[in-house]
């Protein structure tokens, strides 16, 4: 790497604007006031632009690029909230049909473009990663040169450097020891750190505030890492689990390791007669028994024993038995199971009677499990019923053909083949709720609806989040950086004696009014001229 040697003897990296030691300008053309944003240090992005690595570095080191990446990500995030994400669709809803049916052509386009799964899409994660890369490169491009410049800054600065500071004054006098000691005492009273060399003074305080933005960036980077970790398998789970009374289901996100049994689901509602009068009027408006007071699942948690053998019923070991209520989840092994919803009196089984249409004679009954129906029901004596087709949530599609919306038995329909001794080939019959269509139009036998059996279903949310501590650490570091950079300022005051004159200069990264007050306090009764704001002078001259 090339280097530039200053007249003072200090060796600076190529691209340095102001000597790190004495502050002398190293470039021919300079503005009236010194650019102290990074203390004139050499930034890689402003120096090299030859290789592909240089170009990538320069692209991501641009603050404008970082801002545009954030704006694009925010716009995409907002677009993802126009319609519900796929994870929040109603249970059993199919994304490929739901968006079009609910939101029309725009909904279909929303689905086709992949916005229904936006926050887990590769391009959205790429945007998040790009913001992280931009933060890292922006920080490294600035913090390393700034640290080097502040570390190497000399006490005795070039007169040209001091004259180009925003606050500057020059007094033709000799600073005696008593006046100098008084100034040093006042500087220490204002909590400045003092360094002296050859009659010159450098007073500095609040340097740590210069690192505030970079601490801020570190917090943001950690926060973004935490957000992206949510897409790593096993780090984050947010799934819905519906379990009918008396049934056991595998808990999603546990890889078949844990199972939950719904022993019983119960609902308690508000009653105007038993509640206080202040609530009774509101309950009467809504209706007695319509507002849930408490709903809970009497659950049993099981753990699978041994390895998973597909097709084999798992051996389960009881872990615990608890009641799951709203805001009182079941917790185990980093998982939490919350009570969030329920459905009462849901279809579970349908019972039919096989009868002769003319004589009404019954040849037996069959009970169909609507979640897992058998293919054949043998009634004995040569009578049996085959289920040729089963549509749990029956409707007619756009082509006018029978189809099913979901796998949930909201509106079950069947195509039966009724086999009897006198009809060995069977008679086809389409049976739905309050609707029967016979295949030949003149069947001898029919399946007469007898009754239904219902069950309550509990709606649970399974959550696991191992990224919360990462997000919390990132957020805490971010806030520390905000406070560090917002409530403190990096102030520097130089006093330089040379050739019968005393030069006073001051610089701060913000709050110039505060620095002016410090200078007025320190230089009072010292005989030195108070520095003037050269930036204001330049404005008035224009």
Swiss-Prot record:
Major location category of this protein? membrane
Q: What is this protein called?
A: Cytochrome c biogenesis protein ResB
Q: Which domain of life is it from?
A: Bacteria
Q: Where are the transmembrane segments?
A: 63-83, 118-138, 217-237, 468-488
Job of this protein: Required for the biogenesis of c-type cytochromes.
Write down the membrane topology: Multi-pass membrane protein
GO cellular-component term (any): plasma membrane
> Which InterPro entries has this protein been placed in?
Cyt_c_bgen_Ccs1/CcsB/ResB, ResB-like_domain
Gene disruption: observed consequences:
Cells lacking this gene exhibit a lack of cytochromes c but normal contents of cytochrome a and b. Can sporulate.
Pfam assignment, any one: ResB
Record keywords: Cell membrane, Cytochrome c-type biogenesis, Membrane, Transmembrane, Transmembrane helix
Intracellular or extracellular location(s) = Cell membrane
Transmembrane: present as a keyword of the record? yes
One GO BP annotation here? cytochrome complex assembly
């Amino acid at each position: 790497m090339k280097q530039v040697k200053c007249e003072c003897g200090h060796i600076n990296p190529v691209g340095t604007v102001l000597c790190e030691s004495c502050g002398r300008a190293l470039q021919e053309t300079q503005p009236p006031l010194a650019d102290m944003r990074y203390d004139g240090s050499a930034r890689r992005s402003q120096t090299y632009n030859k290789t592909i690595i240089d170009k990538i570095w320069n692209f991501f080191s641009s603050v404008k690029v970082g801002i545009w990446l954030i704006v694009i990500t925010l716009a995409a995030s907002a677009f993802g909230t126009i319609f519900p994400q796929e994870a929040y669709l109603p249970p059993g809803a199919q994304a490929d049909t739901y968006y079009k049916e609910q939101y029309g052509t725009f909904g279909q386009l929303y689905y086709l473009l992949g916005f229904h799964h936006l926050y887990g899409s590769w391009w959205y994660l790429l945007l998040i990663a790009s913001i992280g890369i931009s933060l890292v490169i922006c920080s490294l491009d600035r913090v390393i040169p700034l640290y080097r410049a502040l570390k190497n800054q000399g006490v005795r600065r070039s007169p040209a450097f001091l004259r180009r500071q925003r606050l500057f004054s020059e007094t033709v006098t000799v600073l005696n020891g008593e006046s100098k000691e008084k100034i040093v005492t006042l500087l220490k009273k204002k909590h400045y750190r003092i360094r002296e060399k050859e009659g010159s003074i450098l007073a500095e305080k609040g340097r740590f505030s210069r690192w505030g933005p970079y601490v801020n960036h570190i917090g943001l980077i950690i926060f973004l890492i935490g957000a992206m970790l949510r897409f790593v398998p096993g780090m984050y789970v947010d799934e819905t689990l519906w379990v009918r009374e008396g049934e056991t289901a595998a808990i999603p996100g546990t890889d078949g390791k844990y199972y939950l049994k719904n022993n019983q689901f119960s609902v308690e509602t508000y009653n105007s007669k038993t509640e206080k009068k202040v609530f009774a009027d509101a309950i009467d408006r809504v209706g007695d028994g319509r507002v849930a007071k408490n709903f809970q699942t009497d659950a049993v948690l099981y753990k699978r024993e041994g390895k998973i053998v597909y097709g084999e019923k798992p051996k389960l070991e009881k872990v615990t038995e608890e009641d799951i209520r709203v805001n009182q989840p079941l917790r185990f092994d980093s998982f939490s199971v919350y009570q969030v919803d329920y459905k009462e009196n849901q279809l579970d089984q349908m019972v039919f009677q096989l009868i002769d249409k003319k004589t009404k004679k019954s040849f037996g009954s069959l009970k169909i499990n609507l979640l897992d129906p058998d293919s054949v029901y043998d009634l004995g004596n040569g009578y049996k019923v085959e289920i040729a087709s089963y549509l749990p949530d029956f409707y007619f599609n756009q082509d006018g053909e029978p189809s099913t919306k979901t796998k949930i038995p909201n509106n079950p329909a069947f195509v039966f083949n009724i086999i009897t001794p006198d009809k060995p080939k069977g008679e086809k019959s389409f049976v739905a709720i309050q609707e029967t269509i016979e295949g030949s139009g003149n069947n001898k036998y029919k399946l007469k609806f007898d009754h239904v059996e219902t069950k309550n279903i509990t709606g649970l949310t399974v959550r696991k989040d191992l990224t919360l501590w990462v997000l919390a650490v990132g957020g805490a570091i971010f806030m520390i950086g905000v406070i560090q950079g917002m409530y403190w300022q990096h102030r520097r005051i130089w006093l330089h004696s040379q050739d019968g004159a005393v030069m006073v200069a001051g610089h701060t990264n913000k709050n110039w009014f505060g620095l002016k007050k410090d200078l007025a306090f320190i230089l009072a009764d010292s005989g030195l001229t108070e520095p003037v704001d050269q930036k204001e002078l330049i404005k008035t001259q224009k």
